[in-house]
A protein has these predicted regions:
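Noncatalytic, basic helical substrate-engagement surface that gates or grips nucleic-acid strands
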Residues: 2-128, 132-147
């Protein structure tokens, strides 16, 4: 049985961004979300020792849910620009680390995580997210690490 670690990338980025003070790189760019994301990722790898890792991201585009319900996520505040600027840096870091990530215009990260957890139900799947909606995926082979 393989250990598969699935990570809600947007959730971790938001958590790191709001949890840490506004850290800056030597060039002056804000990097608190990158720093926090990296620390949480390394901690999860050390704790779970996964055979496979995938980080799922939202693309921030309207999905099929917006067509079904016009007010879907209408109450959400827009993502801060200085957080948006850190997403490409995290993706570059993941590439450098050899960690796969996936995003799709049509789906949100939790859709991707749900699909992958279902497809790998014969394995030990650990989902890392603070999104309580993902609790519905928990079963004998899928656990949720709330961050």
């Amino acid at each position: 049985m393989r250990n598969i670690l699935l990570i809600d990338g947007n959730n971790l980025m938001f958590r790191a961004y709001y949890a840490l003070p506004p850290l800056r790189s030597l060039s002056g760019k804000l990097c608190n979300a990158v720093y926090g994301f990296c620390n949480m990722l390394i901690s999860a790898i050390e704790q779970h020792k996964p055979d496979y890792i995938l980080v799922a991201f939202d693309k921030g585009k309207k999905t099929f849910r917006h067509k079904l319900f016009a007010d879907y996520k209408a109450q959400r505040h827009p993502t801060p620009e200085d957080l948006i600027a850190q997403f490409p840096i995290v993706k570059e870091m993941l590439d450098t680390m050899g960690v796969k990530y996936y995003d799709d215009d049509r789906y949100e990260a939790d859709d991707i995580l749900g699909c992958l957890s279902s497809q790998n139900s014969q394995d030990n799947v650990i989902i890392m997210s603070g999104d309580r909606d993902l609790l519905q995926l928990v079963d004998k082979s899928v656990s949720l690490q709330m961050n």
